[in-house]
């Protein structure tokens, strides 16, 4: 035996008497110092999940799993499957808080001398008409982009590629409202997409020459606003007065029908949540511009001349006899391009993404309140015609309006919740406040369609009341007394 070979230990290897000392950890590599002069920003947090809508997808068949040994082979012959609920979940966006916010902007602009001198043709109803067009176009843009709004694809193509509405500027304070419309996929793979939608023309516009009762408060109809601007500009007045400032009444005659003839739902639109107040000087200068502007190439809608037949007529771009009329929008877009320069954060419509934020999954429910009920279902006197001397909106948001927001998405980001709470674009007005004053009740199946809206929510907000808080932020953070330079 080799003398260098150790003898075997018959009792086995020795057991250590203590713990094994830990291995030496690798040394820490220090982070390289930032380059001098470089901007240091924290990385943006990644989204918790992909937000792009799935689009129309056929239901999946039952899944198959591998067999199991022994007794489990009996149940393996009956594999479970996921029930696909991929039907889309629609909601009709609400624009009432949007126009309240626009009303705050308009109040600031009535005292912005540089703007008024450069745009004597501006009036608050011009702002309302412009925003109502952009709002409808944005809804169509999202709806068609998801693959579900094919019926509106041609109309959208004309609006974006021929009228170039994608280039129109959105005033900064209104940008979050447009961003909140983005479509998203459902909270689970087997839940359908959640999409803001536009009702079909026959659902939106009734044979009574008025919007459907469920949509009258939520969807602005540009044709109604255009009709009022035309009547303001062309209605004759007493030559001795030299002005119609103290005599002209908004909404006293709509589509050539007076207040006792036209449907009262024409006076429930969301634009009436904003004020039409202006000074006499601005009123007179605007009329001097719009009177000749409407002289050629425009025909006013007349309810006596037969029903409207297509959605572009509600936007004001097609007359009752089918003729294209878009000169009025050219004037308005020029005015509002200058208007947007007086607000920080203004962006073109084309910059708003149709997918991604996630605010669409969150909905608000108003608390029961007498003032809110009177606002939703007003008495005739509360929606009567009014003059430009009236400072308050005709349908002013009630100060007691409180809304509780909720959703059933387990991965939604807090920023999406903030967008929804701020903008109030997904609302269940049909809950908690019953109809009155002979109004037709708002029915939920017209506003929300799809199984997601029936899921039990698990995230809630406290009651939210933002009406009086917009003015401070807009005045201090957005509005400028001098126009921002175009980039």
From Swiss-Prot:
Organism of derivation: White clover cryptic virus 1 (isolate Boccardo/2004)
Protein name: Capsid protein
Domain of life: Viruses
Subcellular location: Virion
Stretch list, region Disordered: 1-66
Main location: virion
Keyword field contains NAD: no
Role played: The capsid protein self-assembles to form an icosahedral capsid with a T=2 symmetry made of 120 subunits.
Biased amino acid composition, Low complexity: 30-41
Keywords: Capsid protein, T=1 icosahedral capsid protein, Virion
